[in-house]
């Protein structure tokens, strides 16, 4: 369990995806989706890392590609691109497909980015000027998310995979701002979560926001399946959706059923805390002050979870949680690793000098 806790804490703090210039700050992506998209960069991230991106057709010489159109940067003067042998795609490229190539800014080499069927020129032209997520304002995020939600009806594998990966990198508060753009039936038909299990967490979050009979039925069935298996990666997302649908009035039941029940495993309890964290950070369906009040009860009944609560206390600069966290530190009921994590969080909230003045002698 201790190893799981460390992994969870890393995921909750965030995942930094670094590739040349594209960096995903840990505070942006909804943590209930962290880890579901895999380590590889999304199509958009790859385009961001290129100074030129274009569509081409493969010639009889497999390494040569005839340029069709450019959707980012300046069109090369030569009408063909010669791809390094190491960058050639695995297997055969369908004759009807266009090939997307990018000239990477840092390595100054051409890269194979994927294949796409003809007829998506306008979509690619919209992708070309997209910015790093680190540079997006709230309005930029909303516009970007609405663009990808509007792409769900395109029956094109590259586009649907891109939509999944980009929405998975979206802050939960932005997802909520796009509520009117969510269509539960379209989400299920397009993202096919039963066929692609890695998409289930994102779909659960979006269906929790969209609501309606179709969404509620899928969420209910998914919760039954998760309860049966007790090892699913979508538990946190399903609990976020539960909180979104039921609101703050359900918090007492949520605490009893999902956090303090004796039958729960530590991982299940921490998934529930992650769901509370997502809602508290968004400060929407569940106001942050209600999450903080529930955290006080968590610290009383499950002090072994204090390190995770402390992470949110630091992120929200929530001083009301400092006294109970200090009491837990002084009681010596958590592991050494948890003590260090809680100590760093307290220092972040109250400042180094005040923290060192008030800390327990055992921390010296």
Where is each model-derived feature located?
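N-terminal secretory signal peptides that target proteins for export/translocation
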Residues: 1-5
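Transition segments tied to proteolytic processing and entry into folded domains
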Residues: 22-155, 159, 165-169
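Short coil turns that connect the paired helices of HEAT/ARM alpha-solenoid repeats
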Residues: 150-158, 192-198, 225-230, 261-264, ...
């Amino acid at each position: 369990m201790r190893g799981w806790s460390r992994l969870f804490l890393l995921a909750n703090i965030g995942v930094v995806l670094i590739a040349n210039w594209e960096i995903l700050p840990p505070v942006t992506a909804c943590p209930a989706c962290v880890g579901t998209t895999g380590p590889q960069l999304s199509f958009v991230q790859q385009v961001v890392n290129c100074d030129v991106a274009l569509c081409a057709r493969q010639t009889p010489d497999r390494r040569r590609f005839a340029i069709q159109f450019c959707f980012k940067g300046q069109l090369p003067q030569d009408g063909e691109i010669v791809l390094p042998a190491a960058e050639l795609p695995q297997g055969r490229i369908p004759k009807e497909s266009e090939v997307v190539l990018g000239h990477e800014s840092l390595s100054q080499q051409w890269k194979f980015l994927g294949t796409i069927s003809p007829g998506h020129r306008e979509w690619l032209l919209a992708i070309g000027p997209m910015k790093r997520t680190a540079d997006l304002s709230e309005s930029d995020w909303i516009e970007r998310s609405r663009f990808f939600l509007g792409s769900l009806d395109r029956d094109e594998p590259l586009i649907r995979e891109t939509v999944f990966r980009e929405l998975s990198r979206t802050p939960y508060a932005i997802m909520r701002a796009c509520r009117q753009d969510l269509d539960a039936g379209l989400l299920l038909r397009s993202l096919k979560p039963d066929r692609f299990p890695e998409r289930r967490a994102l779909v659960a979050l979006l269906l929790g926001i969209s609501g309606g009979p179709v969404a509620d039925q899928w969420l209910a069935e998914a919760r039954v399946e998760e309860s049966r298996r007790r090892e699913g990666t979508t538990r946190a997302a399903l609990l976020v959706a539960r909180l979104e649908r039921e609101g703050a009035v359900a918090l007492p039941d949520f605490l009893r059923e999902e956090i303090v029940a004796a039958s729960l495993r530590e991982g299940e309890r921490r998934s529930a805390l992650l769901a509370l964290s997502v809602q508290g950070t968004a400060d929407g369906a569940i106001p942050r002050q209600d999450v903080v009040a529930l955290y006080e009860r968590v610290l009383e009944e499950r002090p072994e979870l204090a390190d995770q609560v402390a992470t949110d206390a630091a992120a929200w600069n929530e001083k009301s949680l400092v006294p109970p966290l200090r009491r837990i530190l002084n009681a010596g009921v958590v592991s050494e690793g948890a003590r260090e994590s809680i100590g760093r969080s307290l220092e972040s909230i109250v400042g180094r000098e005040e923290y060192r003045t008030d800390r327990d002698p055992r921390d010296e």
